[in-house]
Amino acid sequence: MARTATGNEKRTALAGHHHVPLHGEKQTGPTDPNAELAVTLLLRRRHELPELHTALGGKHPQQRRHLSREALAQKHGARSDDIARVSRFARRHKLDLHEIAPHRRSVVLSGKASAIEHAFGIRLVEVEHARGKYRAALGKPTVPVELAGIVHAVLGLNTRPCAKRPKPHRQHAVEPFWTVPEMARAYGFPDTLGGAKQRIALIELGGGYYKQDLQKFFSSLQRPMPSIRSVAVDGARNSPASPDQLQQFFDVLHGRRKLSEVPADVLAAAQATMEVTMDIELAAALAPGADIVVYIAPNTEQGIYNAVSRELSGKEKLPCALSISWGEPETEVSRAYLKSVDSLLRDAAMLGVTVCVSSGDEGAMNGATDGKPRVNFPASSPHALSCGGSTVHASRGRDVRESAWNCVLYGMRGATGGGVSRRFPTPPWQKKHGVPLSPNGRKGRGVPDVAGPADPRRGCAILVGGRRCSSVGTSAVAPLWAALVACLNQELGARCGYIAPLLYNLAASDTNALRQITKGNNGFYQAGPGWNACTGLGSPRLEHLLEALRVAP
């Protein structure tokens, strides 16, 4: 039991908040004590959620009983007396109550950095790394004993970027392999207005898009402009890279300019813009009847948590799917953060929202320096649909041949992320599918669950900055599956929601709902029959998947 340096207040440490330093990380000095900061406190639930596999897992979508937002907030939101205790704590430490959201189980406190340090018994420092400049908290955060068990996490002390993107290098120009309508036909998407009356939320970390790109893109498809709008989170907004920044980025890709000549912030802005635009164009083109909402949040743990939380708890139409095209190795983040986001994804499952997450683009090793493979989070959450990548070798109508994606990408090797989690145990629905032991010798959650086209040499035509480009990476697969879920929900008249258990059940019964991908590797794991750690259960055959779900008991 600790005590503050200025009094006899008994305190307890918050579990799982260790700072995991990155290789090459360098501290440059203390955070300005007068800097104004905001942190998000995540509180315990009024009542715990039921075990999801029992409540939802094996049931047909039309048999599932999802919670409404109101029921989730009333039964599983924060307690009023817990919020009162946090409010008293904030006043004692001269922190402002910036936002109180019992339905989201969160309280946002703001104040000077020195007050934040004193309130939580930590030291804030500034850090430089190849990923950029950010803030880190040294020491374990503590809270008064009366908040023990009430405050589960404090987000915002650390501002390290969540999404990491590979540096582009010179390569030959990549021409798109096919158009969106061609890809849609290959994977069985309907020719009609798929996804009608559905809502897809895209979670983006920085960057933005140009409306004129979207208008030209859909005009080229001879389609009307879909319903697309952006939502700003925590000060972030739709901020696409400038035309000059995009020009420098494409000059690097096409060998007209050296990488060393382009500032890192220019590359980051251009890559983020390409990512956001790609997500929108693919999701909206594959499910043209759906409303697309783009949440643009800061590239931090706090930013991503707040974006997902606000969409799930909002007052507008509940989304059928969330698409998250980012990730970082689960071994590089705190356990408190893992548990916090995983808890949000459990909320999504109970609400009937499918969360599609890209598995990563750096293969099984995923930038590891210890020689051991590692998987990305939140793709490793058992409550996410983890989306891996394939290379399409041929497509004649709906006859598609694929292998696990593993190629040279922008001068670097790009490959589908996949492996076995070191943080999450094997979920019940994966136990009979041959998931190997994790690198630490334990049973873990296998990644990915499914796959889709990720190889830029066989990518889909998109439009960014007025330029025709090829879709790239597992970031392109998450919006594809989100669009697929929108089409399924429309046709079934019910929410698929927590869809992974359904897909594994279908795979076990040998249906044609998924196309197995049995060739290729991701640098450590080999593709093969059944589930594999490169492409999961395989790529979709939407029409067969819909038929299987309609007749499932």
Across the structure, where does each feature detected by a protein language model lie?
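Substrate-binding/charge-relay-adjacent region of secreted/lumenal peptidase catalytic domains
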Residues: 2-99, 108, 113-389, 412-417, ...
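A generic structural signal for beta-strand entry/edge sites
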Residues: 104-106
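Short, glycine- and charge-enriched coil/turn segments that flank and shape catalytic ligand pockets
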Residues: 366-370, 396, 511
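Short clusters of hydrophobic/aromatic residues that line enzyme substrate/ligand-binding pockets
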Residues: 378, 405, 429, 462, ...
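Short acidic, Gly/Pro-enriched loop/turn segments at secondary-structure junctions
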Residues: 394-400
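Extracellular low-complexity, O-glycosylation-prone Ser/Thr/Pro/Gly-rich "stalks"
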Residues: 395, 494-553
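Phosphate/diphosphate-binding glycine-rich loops and adjacent basic-rich segments that engage nucleotide
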Residues: 401-406, 410
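Active-site-proximal alpha-helical segments within enzyme catalytic domains
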Residues: 476-489
